[in-house]
Every structure is written in structure tokens, then in C-alpha cells.
Amino acid sequence: MDQRPAPGELCLDHVAHFVPDLQAAARDLEKLGFVVTPESAHRTQHGPAGTSNRCLMFEQGYVEILAPTMDTPNAQRVRERMKSFVGVHLCCFGTPAPAAEHARLAAHGFEPEPLVNLARNLQDGTPVKFNVVYVPPAKMPEGRIQYCEHLTESQMWREGWVNRGLRLDAAYVVAADPAEVAARWARFMGVLPRRDGDFVELPLARGKVVVGSRAALVRLLGEAPPAPALAGYALSSARPGEKRRVVKLPPSLGGVWVIG
């Protein structure tokens, strides 16, 4: 299942919930009828990252459920985010050229950290690997906003793990000043923003980012955290008879879905 964007393109690769109890979150997703991947622990070229995840793989994109497991700087950043709320704190863009994105972000003042070689072993010992571009939290305060390149995508999108008929379609950003925040995200993403009613959309080759005020997002989603934050995401469905609806997720996960 080809998830890698074409040269010169970007996609909405995944979003992530930061949660205190990985297994409780996974159980709640399984009760909702989803296939959840087994747990695996992250590591970088410097050693254990201190977090583990389980994932919902879709036909396009995926949702990561991530929990801190150790006392590392990375795990502490996750815990700090969860002090505000349990829910969606990460938005990742897929790229075929992470080094080029790193250079572009540096040129635009985002001060990216050195390229990270992220990996984790699946339950059967098979490694999955990524190149990841992070920026300091102050540069993108809405969450952990990053780029990644998949190096072993066939191992992640295994036939038995894919939740068929679903695609990751949009991520929602809460902004005190939607125009200003959308302009910054547009520079980060290298795309042109466009106004859509109460929102500003940032379209990608696959998926999009939607920026709006808290009031506008509450009208759309039913709830939204204070700015700056990520409010939730949208899944598009190819399932027959699926009507567009907003789903409030269990407290173990936090956040909301727009699905349909």
C-alpha cells in the first residue's frame, strides 16, 4: 500500500493522541470495532526515546496512540502536553525529501533540530524506520508539528492491520488569530492558504489542515481546547451508508473525530 508522496508533494501522514494509559486507549478503540496494531517502543540514533505506541492504520494515513514509558526528554515533553489535556497533540506531514524540508524550514526561521533517525521494532522483531524533522515547540506551539519519511512502509501497512474504507482527511488547528496562524502554518508546510467561511484551509496532495477560532471549531466539533492547540481530525469513509458525523472519543483518548 503506497503511502509515500510523489517528489515535490506533501501529505497529511498521521496525527497522534498523547495518552497516559496506552492499553486502556487501545481497548476502547477495539470496542469501537477498530483494528489496533501491537505495542512497539520508539528509539533514535541516541537510544530509547521513552515512548511507545499503538496505531490505527487506514487506507491513507494513520492515527498514532502514544504514551510516555520512561524518564527521557522526549517522554517529558509528552507528559507536559498532557498536563493541558489528553488528546491530539501531534500532526505529521509525509515527505519524500526530509533533508530538503529541513533546509527549507531553517531558511524560514523555524530552527529545525538535527534530522532524527527514528525506529521501533514490531512485535515480531521487524524494525520500522523513519527520518523525522522536529522544530522547537515555541516555533509551532499548537502541538508537536513535524515531518517524516517512511523507510519501511510495507511493514506498517500490513494487510491484517488496515482499517478498510477509511482515510485520514484533515487536522483541525485552534487559533486565537486564524489568519496569522494559518500564514505561519503555510510557511511551515510550503503551501498556499485559502479561506473557507469561518476557516482557513491549507490543502495538500493528500489531506489538509483546517485553522479556525475556538468558537468556530466548537460550532463544528462540539468542543475544542483553548488556543494554541490541535482540536481533532477528520476521517473520510468509503463505507456504504456512512453519514458524516462528529464522534466524541472516550476519555482514555480525548479529542473528537469528524467521520463520514
Regions found by a protein language model. Name each.
Residues 39-41:
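A short acidic/basic microdomain associated with nuclease active sites
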Residues 1-12, 17-37, 49-51, 58-117, ...:
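Glyoxalase I/VOC metalloenzyme domain signal
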